[in-house]
């Protein structure tokens, strides 16, 4: 691997693995509102928000940090009132109870209009127009949770990258394979990749804070109970499940707790991190081993998401848990061959799990994902692998990954439409 390629990979990871407070879809909407408000230069009197179906789906049922409220309107209001676009996915970290009350007024006065953007193919699309005193400003995020492609004040266009984006092109030219991910994780100079330890610190802290409260379905806390230990044991496996689900519990309930995200998703960051951290700590692994296993996990997720896309009908925890399965397999003493086996086993098992939006029950799916990650790693270490005569699995692991992402990005589009239709027509 050339030094230039190594630096490209490190830059890619540093772009994709970043802190986030709250579910990233409503937070990305708040970020877009903050940018439009800053461009307007005044407190908006009216805010119009147009969203792709996938953003709408992921923002409907999730808690917004520091508000005790669920859904988009309060995220939009706070984006306008206290949001700072420089904070990126931590845009609402300056929220106060007073701001929340003021935000409720904006909602009650019907100053916020949120609707579906029709006839677009981009699954991650946010368009915000803010108006005040006869003036208006527009901001558009597209393709990535923090990727602004258009900003304008009145007729003055300040940014227009709607046709081409240099950064997006640069990302696409970096072609990863599972072998390349594995080699990078094991050979990159330690000091160049040590930064990945921040994922362990931040996400473990989120889980530990969650154990102290009663967030969402409190799945993580429940898994530490006496009754649960009688059934599942007090083991590395049960600890992996409890820590990972606890961090997800807190996030989906809207706790003001930062986590390290991956590819625009906090739950993906949690699922790629905590199983690896818990396994490493409870098996006495060195700091270097933890760093390399975390790097393998996170870069595997980034690699799979390159062809899947930011948002899809496929639950992101399937992808993220595949990363942690790789990291755990390597920590168990696995070779590249066994890491590839773990990936094949994951794809054979979990492909097709739907995403029906971000919400407290995501903790259940995360737990399913990471329990399968451990199972897949254990199978791989016994040299057991789902074969290419079975279903969607190919002899070549990279082709199996492409099969997974093709199902998620193409095959499940109708599923996505039906899921959103069901969610928007429920009698609740």
From Swiss-Prot:
InterPro entries: Ser_deHydtase-like_asu, UPF0597. GO terms for biological process: L-cysteine catabolic process to pyruvate. This is UPF0597 protein BF3772. HAMAP family: UPF0597. Belongs to the UPF0597 family. GO terms for molecular function: L-cysteine desulfhydrase activity. PANTHER family: UPF0597 PROTEIN YHAM (PTHR30501:SF2). It comes from the Bacteria.
